Every structure is written in C-alpha cells, then in structure tokens.
C-alpha cells in the first residue's frame, strides 16, 4: 500500500493479518468514502491468502480506534437518494468484512463510535482496552440520523433488542467494562497486550457463539417484541415531543429487521438514513456539531496564551467546588482553594470526592485514579500557595466591593503575570477591574450551574483586557472540557440577557392566569429540556431573578418583570428546589415530585390558574422575546458571530438543538416573518415586542445571520 493509505496490511509470521488504521494528517481516524477502495484491496489480499489464520483490525493512532464516519460526506449529498447510496455503500463494505473466511477481530483502544463501531460489529469478535479513553457507541441520533452501515441490524442481534434500542436511541457511550457486561465486546485487556490478545483470539478455529440473556431472548420473540416496541415508542414520544424524527425511524428500522429479517432491515436502514439526512432537524443538528467543533478550535484572540500550570479559586461554595473539580479532574491542573473558613474548603473537597467516588462506584475509574485526581486539590484560609498561580478564579458573592477587594488581594499575593477571572453573572467586568493595578489581566469567566454538567462558559474581556489574557482564559476553559464563547462586557453578557425576557414573559403569563404546568409543557413541546418556570425552580428563584434589576437599569422597561409577584414569592421563602419550596411541590431532600405544582402558588400571586392560551401561543410569546434580544446582541456585537450566539443558546440554556440555535431558527423563519410576528405581538401585548433595528434592516435587505459563505460543513 502507499504511504498515504489510511488502511495498511501487515501479515505476521504466525499468519495473522494485521490491518492498521491511520488516517494521514489527522489526529483521529474517521471513515471516508474514498477509503473503500483501500479496504477492498486489502480484503482481496486476505481472501487470496489461503495460509491466513485470522485478521485483526487495530488503530495506529495513540488514543482512538475510529471516531465515526466523516460527517462532511452527508453535506455533499444533494438529495435523499445520494445519502441512501452512501449508506448502502457502507453496508456493502461491512458485509464484505463480515464475510471473510477467517476469524476477524476488532482490537479497540480509544473512541470507537458511529461508523467505527459499525465496522467493529462487522468483525466476528471485539476486544477493547480497560483505558478510560475507550468508549463504544452509536451517536448518530444526536445528528438527527441513524446508523447507516448496518448498526441497526447487527447490534440488536449481538447485545439484545432492549440494550440496542437504549444505545441507539440515546447515543450513549459504553465504557469498556459496561461493553463487556452488555456483550458488545468479548474481552477487556490492558493496552500493552491488546494486539497479542486479539491475535490469539484470531487464531482460534472456532469462536463460541454468545448466548443472549433470558430477558433479551424473551424480548426477541414476537410477544415480547411487540410489548417492548409499544413501550419504547410511548416513552420516546414523551421524551422527544415529536421534534426528533430520527428516533421514530430508528425504532421502525430495528423492528423491521427483527420481524422481517436482516435483508429487509438493511434496506429500511439505508432508506431511512437517506431521508433523515435531508430533514431540517438533521441539518440543524449537524450545523451545531460543526459550529461547536469550530468554537473549540477558536483560540479566542490572535495572541499566544500565557503560562497555565496551576490555578487558584476564591470561594469554596457550590460554584467554587464545581470549578475546582473541572479544573483538576478534567483539566489535570493543580488547584488551590481559598475560603474564609475551613468549612468552605471542606465543602469544595467533598464536592470533588462525591463526583469521583460516583465514578469509582460505576467502575469508570479506579480508586487509585480518584485519589490521584483529588490530590490535585488543596485549600487554605489565606493566600499561602497562591504566589505561583497563573490564573485565579473568583467565585464569591455578587458584591462589587468584595470582588474589587479580591482583585487587590490577588494582585498583592500572586505573581505579576497572574490573571484574575471573575465568575460573576451580572456585574460589569470593567467595574470589577476599576481599581486594578493590572486591569489588562482582569477578565470574566462565567460558568453555569451545575458546573460539572453545563458545557458552556462565557469569556468576558472588558475594554482593557489584553489579548493574551483572553487567549489564556480560553485555553483554560478548553482544558476544563468547556465550550467557550467570547462575549462583550455588557449587562447580562449574552446567555442571561436572552434568557431573562423569556422567563419574565412566563411569569407575566402566570400573573394573567395561565397555569404553571401549561406554560412549562408548552415550552417543552417547543423543544426546551424543561419549561421556564421549572428552570427558575432549578436554578433558584432568588438566583434567577437577581439579574432582572441590573438588566432593567441597563436596557429599560422591556426587562421589567411583575415585581410584586417576584417579591411575593421570595417573601414567602420560596427559592425553588434548593430549599424545597418553589412553584412545584418537593419531597424529601428537595426532590421534585412528579410534575405537581404547589397549588398555594396561585393564591400567593392572586390568580385562579385557568389556562386560556394555546401551547403554541405560550411558546411564541416566550421564544419571540428571546429571539428579538438575541438579534440585539448580534447588532451590539455582544457576541462575535451568529455561530457563537447559536452555541451559547444551545449549550447554555438548552435552546432546541434541532432548530440549530436562535440565529439559524430566525434564518429559517426569515427576517420578514420575524418582524411581522413581533409587530403582531406588540399590538397585542405591548412595546416590549417591538422588533429590534437589526431585524427591521435585515427584513428590508432580505439578509440572513448566516451568510451564504457559511455552511454546516466542517471544513
């Protein structure tokens, strides 16, 4: 084979063929259509070599097997027929691998996802390493697709239909031990012996057939299968609200294969893949994927980042504890926490311990790895251990004088190059830096709660922040596993600014008599993970409403909330889930009961709670205000691009991913339709709905936020 081949064949002296996978010039292996000829040439050599005892597919990359198929291939398809052909070509190649006359083993280390797992499924057996980097899954549903190279047919027959449905419908990734338990792999070994273990398995003349567990065998029968698919359809419809067509097609295709045989299943899989590839939902989800990939590669500024070897954190509360965990346990950086008392430090340490112990309990990591990661975190009630910190993150109360004091103390106790990053959600960074000796090293770094789960951070430079400070802070965010967007130092920044009118309108409709559950259900139906009122309960009613006066002072009446209602709720000691008193009823330890609204809430705000608006009207009122504010942020350059605005909304507040983000959604509606809708709502509900100048200009010029030169492709 030539040196540019992604697949290279080597026949060992013991007559086992080793096919090494190494896509030239790429950090990860992905499958491309042009590789098919290379693979077929190798398969031909294998078939012709009658002395071969077996075949092993293994990656030559350091930490991944195959991360999936190259998604750009789908974007190049002009219609469903072309996408279907792409799937059929993949199916045929996998069938040729499966048809080899000798044992074929996939030796897996690192990510084995999508088309990579479909290739592994076409092999006769699979062995993987016990490394934390090794994960196996079929995440195509997250792109609005289904596995198109045989995955919907081979996986159910290997691991059972219920396990396969769960994996394919959710896109969940299994770690090595989970994959072994599920029957997805046949053995788990240390990386050092992966190849030899695979070779030994390949030499076996007969490979024992795995027997499915009794439960899976029952579910594979006609009666069990009918019951299972009926339940899965019901649960999936409740979860997706009909917004994700891929899930229904996945269920149909798997059921077809089990009921009518593999041939019909493969045919249904290819057709469904082609049709789904052309849906607006898949196009939007792929656009989000490419946008997030580009954001993760964006350095934030043109300057090189400064040193980043250790981090300090001020405050050991909920946010400080979460920031310490992502910095040490995801970023691998030593962390020193300062709190005014040892309780705060202990809280932060316990925060990380609990998260790590859960990983140990689930066998994601070993106890030794837990101890190693926890050892990166230390604490003190003074500034001992801070002198060499490259960046210090402040996570104290939202009090401007206190934060300014923190700046002064860090400048006094840390190195001259130390960056001060504030986790404020509402205070201007320029005000925090007002008295700084080195204002160019002060920046905002806004995390979202819970820190360990929320993928977004906002990086907020003020007018004097240096380019190097921006680059260093963005670098830290990436090390923490976050997706950073750089936003301007204006009140509310970006995410909270577009979220506030959305929540305000929900509260306003509540005061008009709409029921809590009706408002929340309408927005969940629209595509949000939770409704606005439940969201307020989750983040804390006090926390979620404290920014409203800041925004109202900065931008005027359009940000005003029904103040008497908010005050009444807070005065009744209702903070949401955290104190077990909110809009919803809570059981023990603040657990929310199953969608039960506290009926006392209506009496508290003086309404009876009788819904009059349709779900579509409720969603329209909330969402249009969010979109209008997002357009203002674009106009005022609060965000650098529509791309950043879409990523910020999807990753920061759960804007429906299948719509692609607020800017792709506005482009889909069209600026003219946006303006007309806002004008209609303004006539009904008041000037807060008046379309912003940006949208009016775009409607006049027939412009879009995403230009023709910007595509959903990854290159």
From Swiss-Prot:
GO terms for molecular function: 3-hydroxybutyryl-CoA epimerase activity; enoyl-CoA hydratase activity; long-chain-3-hydroxyacyl-CoA dehydrogenase activity; NAD+ binding. GO terms for biological process: fatty acid beta-oxidation. This is Fatty acid oxidation complex subunit alpha. Its main location: cytoplasm. Pathway: Lipid metabolism; fatty acid beta-oxidation. It is found in: Cytoplasm. In the N-terminal section; belongs to the enoyl-CoA hydratase/isomerase family. It holds the Pfam family 3HCDH. Catalyzes the formation of a hydroxyacyl-CoA by addition of water on enoyl-CoA. Also exhibits 3-hydroxyacyl-CoA epimerase and 3-hydroxyacyl-CoA dehydrogenase activities. The record marks 118, 140 as: Important for catalytic activity. GO terms for cellular component: cytoplasm. Residues 1-190 are annotated as: Enoyl-CoA hydratase. Residues 306-714 are annotated as: 3-hydroxyacyl-CoA dehydrogenase. Keywords: Cytoplasm, Fatty acid metabolism, Isomerase, Lipid degradation, Lipid metabolism, Lyase, Multifunctional enzyme, NAD, Oxidoreductase. HAMAP family: FadJ (MF_01617). The gene is fadJ. Its EC number is 4.2.1.17, 5.1.2.3, 1.1.1.35. The keyword Lyase applies. NCBIfam families: FadJ, PRK11154.1. It catalyses: a (3S)-3-hydroxyacyl-CoA = a (2E)-enoyl-CoA + H2O; a 4-saturated-(3S)-3-hydroxyacyl-CoA = a (3E)-enoyl-CoA + H2O; a (3S)-3-hydroxyacyl-CoA + NAD(+) = a 3-oxoacyl-CoA + NADH + H(+); (3S)-3-hydroxybutanoyl-CoA = (3R)-3-hydroxybutanoyl-CoA. Heterotetramer of two alpha chains (FadJ) and two beta chains (FadI).
């Amino acid at each position: 084979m030539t040196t540019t081949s992604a697949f290279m064949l080597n026949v060992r002296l013991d007559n086992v063929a080793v096919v090494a996978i190494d896509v030239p010039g790429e950090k990860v292996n992905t499958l491309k259509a042009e590789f098919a000829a290379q693979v077929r040439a190798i398969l031909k050599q294998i078939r012709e070599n009658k002395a071969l005892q077996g075949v092993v597919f293994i990656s030559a990359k350091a930490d991944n097997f195959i991360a999936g198929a190259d998604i750009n291939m789908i974007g190049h398809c002009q219609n469903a027929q072309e996408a279907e052909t792409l799937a059929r070509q993949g199916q045929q190649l996998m069938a040729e691998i499966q048809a080899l006359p000798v044992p074929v083993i996939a030796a897996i280390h690192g990510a084995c996802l999508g088309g990579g797992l479909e290739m592994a499924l076409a092999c006769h057996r699979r062995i993987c390493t016990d490394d934390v980097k090794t994960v196996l899954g079929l995440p195509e549903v997250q792109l609005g697709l289904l596995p198109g190279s045989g995955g919907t047919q081979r996986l159910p027959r290997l691991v059972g239909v219920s396990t396969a449905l769960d994996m394919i419908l959710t896109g969940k990734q299994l770690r090595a031990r989970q994959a072994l338990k599920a029957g997805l792999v046949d053995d788990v070994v240390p990386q050092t012996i992966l190849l030899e273990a695979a070779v030994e398995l390949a030499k076996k003349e007969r490979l024992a057939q795995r027997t499915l567990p009794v439960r899976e065998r029952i579910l594979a029968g006609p009666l069990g299968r009918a019951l299972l698919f009926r339940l899965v359809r019901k649960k999936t419809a409740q979860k997706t609200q009909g917004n994700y067509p891929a899930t229904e097609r996945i269920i149909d295709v798997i059921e077809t294969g089990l009921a009518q045989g593999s041939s019909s299943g493969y045919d249904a899989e290819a057709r469904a893949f082609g049709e789904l590839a052309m849906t607006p939902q898949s196009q939007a989800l792929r656009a989000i994927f490419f946008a997030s990939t580009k954001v993760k590669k964006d350095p934030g500024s043109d300057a090189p980042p400064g040193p980043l070897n250790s981090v300090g954190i001020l405050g050991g509360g909920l946010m400080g504890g979460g920031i310490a965990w992502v910095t040490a346990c995801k970023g691998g950086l030593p962390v020193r926490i300062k709190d005014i008392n040892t309780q705060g430090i202990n809280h932060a340490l316990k925060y990380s311990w609990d998260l790590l112990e859960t990983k140990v309990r689930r066998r994601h990591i070993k106890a030794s790895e837990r101890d190693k990661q926890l050892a990166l975190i230390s604490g003190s009630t003074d500034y001992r251990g801070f002198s060499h910190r490259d960046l210090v993150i402040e996570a104290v109360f939202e009090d401007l004088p206190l934060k300014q004091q923190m700046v002064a103390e860090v400048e006094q106790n840390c190195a001259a190059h130390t960056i001060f990053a504030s986790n404020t959600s509402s205070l201007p960074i320029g005000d925090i830096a007002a008295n700084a000796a080195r204002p160019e090293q002060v920046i905002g770094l806004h995390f979202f709660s819970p820190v360990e789960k929320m993928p977004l951070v906002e990086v907020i430079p003020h007018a004097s922040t240096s380019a190097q400070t921006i680059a260093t802070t963005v670098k830290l965010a990436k090390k923490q596993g976050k997706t950073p967007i750089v936003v301007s130092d204006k009140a509310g920044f970006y995410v909270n600014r577009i979220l506030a009118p959305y929540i305000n309108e929900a509260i306003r409709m509540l005061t008009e008599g709409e029921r809590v559950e009706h408002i929340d259900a309408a927005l969940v139906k629209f595509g949000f993970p939770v409704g606005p009122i439940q969201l307020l309960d989750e983040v804390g009613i006090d926390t979620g409403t404290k920014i409203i006066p800041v925004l109202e002072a900065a931008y005027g009446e359009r940000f005003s909330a029904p103040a008497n209602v908010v005050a009444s709720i807070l005065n009744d000691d209702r903070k949401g889930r955290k104190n077990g008193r909110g809009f919803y009823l809570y059981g023990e330890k603040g657990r929310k009961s199953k969608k039960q609204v506290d009926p006392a809430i209506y009496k508290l705000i003086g309404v009876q709670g009788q819904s009059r608006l349709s779900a579509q009207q409720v969603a329209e009122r909330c969402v249009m205000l969010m979109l209008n504010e997002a357009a203002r942020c674009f106009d005022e350059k609060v965000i650098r691009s529509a791309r950043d605005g879409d990523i910020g909304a999807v990753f920061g507040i759960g804007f429906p991913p299948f719509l692609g983000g607020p800017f792709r959604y506005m482009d889909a509606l069209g600026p003219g339709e946006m303006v007309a809708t806002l004008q209609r709502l303004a006539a009904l509900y008041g000037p807060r709905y008046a379309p912003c100048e940006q949208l009016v200009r775009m409607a006049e010029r027939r412009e879009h936020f995403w230009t023709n030169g910007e595509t959903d492709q990854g290159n």
